[in-house]
UniProtKB/Swiss-Prot annotation:
Binds 1 Mg(2+) ion per subunit. It catalyses: 5-methylsulfanyl-2,3-dioxopentyl phosphate + H2O = 1,2-dihydroxy-5-(methylsulfanyl)pent-1-en-3-one + phosphate. Its EC number is 3.1.3.77. This is Enolase-phosphatase E1. Monomer. Bifunctional enzyme that catalyzes the enolization of 2,3-diketo-5-methylthiopentyl-1-phosphate (DK-MTP-1-P) into the intermediate 2-hydroxy-3-keto-5-methylthiopentenyl-1-phosphate (HK-MTPenyl-1-P), which is then dephosphorylated to form the acireductone 1,2-dihydroxy-3-keto-5-methylthiopentene (DHK-MTPene). The lineage of its organism: Bacteria, Pseudomonadati, Pseudomonadota, Gammaproteobacteria, Enterobacterales. GO terms for biological process: L-methionine salvage from methylthioadenosine. GO terms for molecular function: 2,3-diketo-5-methylthiopentyl-1-phosphate enolase activity; 2-hydroxy-3-keto-5-methylthiopentenyl-1-phosphate phosphatase activity; acireductone synthase activity; magnesium ion binding. It comes from Klebsiella pneumoniae subsp. pneumoniae (strain ATCC 700721 / MGH 78578).
Length: 229
């Protein structure tokens, strides 16, 4: 019996184009000015200090760090410091109404149904927890954060590492086999499966021939009550 569902965001609940064509450019355009203006104020000061440790560059100037952040964006590096800064910048965008968090139309009804069945819902994304809460708090369907019991980001581990999913299962307090992980990336599902979790792959486009995981196109194709123990 599935007791908890952990879902990815990009390509799973939300169109990856929203992230890459809206969120990333919005943060990139504002990053240098924001960091320069806020470098001595919290939480930016601590984030920059963390970035110095992350890059083993304790003497790096703010200008050096900004250059590093742009390089990380070009590489799509899953840097915790970068994700934290992006999340702060995106917050202004959501609050100003510059955009709303994209949700596929099949997502909300399924989440509500699973919640009504007594299944705990969680999010696991490479974006910061703050950014996750913003996307679901200012989504196309309004604030749906009340549906989620908790959120995980790269602080729990990288998404393609088996230990990350062991950490999540331990935090949830459920047996791994009672946790269902949803993602569009089969390498993430491979890691989750190796940790004992159940898996389903969202394929919003063509099927993934390299994947052995069950594949569905929509959230309403997922029936957790039918997944055998």
């Amino acid at each position: 019996m599935i007791r908890a569902i952990v879902t990815d965001i990009e390509g799973t609940t939300s169109d990856i184009r929203f992230v890459h064509n809206v969120l990333f450019p919005y943060a990139r355009e504002r990053l240098a000015g924001f960091v320069t203006a806020q470098q001595h104020a919290e939480p930016v000061k601590t984030i920059l200090d963390n970035l110095r440790r992350e890059t083993d560059a304790p003497a790096a100037s703010t200008a050096d760090l900004i250059t590093t952040l742009f390089a990380f964006m070009d590489e799509d590096r899953k840097s915790t410091a970068l994700k934290a800064l992006q999340g702060i910048i995106w917050r202004d965008g959501y609050l100003n109404g510059d955009f709303t968090g994209h949700l596929y139309p099949d997502v909300l009804p399924a989440l509500e149904q699973w919640k009504a069945q007594g299944i705990d819902l969680y999010v696991y994304s490479s974006g910061s927890v703050a950014a996750q809460k913003l996307l679901f708090g200012y989504s196309d369907e309004g604030d749906i954060t009340h549906l989620f019991t908790g959120y995980f980001d790269t602080l729990v581990g990288a998404k393609r590492e088996v230990q990350s999913y062991r950490n999540i299962a331990e935090h949830l307090g459920h047996a791994p086999g009672t946790i269902l992980f949803l993602s569009d990336i089969h390498q993430e599902l491979d890691a989750a499966e190796a940790a004992g979790l159940r898996t389903i792959q969202l394929v919003r486009g063509d099927r993934d021939p390299a994947s052995h995981h069950p594949q569905v196109q929509r959230f309403d194709d997922i029936h957790p009550e039918q997944i055998p123990a």
